[in-house]
Amino acid sequence: GAESLREDDFPTSRTFTALKALPPFVNLYESERRARRRAFVAYLSELAGGTPPARLVVVDVGWKGTIQDNLFALLCRDGDTPVRSITGYYVGLVAEGAAGPGNDKHGLLFSAVGERSPRFRVFNENRALFEVVLAADHGSIVSYEIDAAGHGRAIRGEFEEGEMLAAEVFPVQR
């Protein structure tokens, strides 16, 4: 039946095109998108102690700064938030993504952006090791909401790797 249908490339499929043409879907999508954006800006405000800074700094493992690019599009493009620029610091960068004015990225240990850094190949070959050794001790954020008190709040997903990380990775991190 229809419930077992799987599209190989959903974003380019006829099914997705038809879905995007349905007014109920479009209305729900836009409503949720706006609500999540408001909640995310409120969450940033909470983290900043009142108002998000004009320059936001992102620190991550790497590799292209895609999350940073999405944050830049969300917070800086329309000019309707206090955030005017984002700077990212990464263990390594293998591509610049959408870096540009106001969206700067820096590879701290290695980088392929511009001139390749010394020993780039060695570090690049071991990216999976960096991901494992620098693993977080919590589930990923899956959404944002504004709670009953009007505060922005992150909603975390299940921490599926918790047991394995606790047994194998966290002892190495300490």
Residue ranges: model-predicted function:
Residues 1-174:
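Long, contiguous domain-sized segments
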